[in-house]
Amino acid sequence: NTVIVSKEIPRPTPQEISEIKRSNYTSGDQMLLGLACNIQYGANPELQRILHKTFVDVMLAESQKEGENLNRLTNRAVYLLCWMRRYLPKLFINWKSPEIGCFIYLGGCRNENEALFMSFLGRLPLDVLILCPDLNIKCCLEDKLLYEVNYPESLAITEYPEESSQVKIGTAAYHAERELDTL
């Protein structure tokens, strides 16, 4: 199961945000436990346990950052839950361990919310591939679990090529052969 996102991860819609159950919180721990109740995968208890633990771990790490206030942390958690509801059903349809899906993101994380979501996905039984072909656009994600490969060449690609007709690549030998065919 593969999900491909190009350019940016669309922000949660007001409707998606309103579907997240929340209340007034007085502490970060209370907020995390309250919001974690939104993670429901009843058909697969193992997956629900993994998602719940990963959500709490990632948000606890986020709460340790200097200067994080409760409202900002709550907003980040709500964004994370909205994106989970949007993408995880596609990634984990009929999931059984040790199967893994793949989340491909072309363009790189542009803000802290996207970076948090990618960090969250990277801790799930998923492959996460973040492609940043344009060296002028920097990815703001920094994660100790991230395996990073950088190349000196830059390529201005805005959309992930989903159809083979969009990709036109040939070797020098191939092009020389085609040129000889026209003579």
Feature map (PLM): residue ranges:
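Active-site and donor-binding regions of nucleotide-sugar-utilizing enzymes
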Residues: 62-150
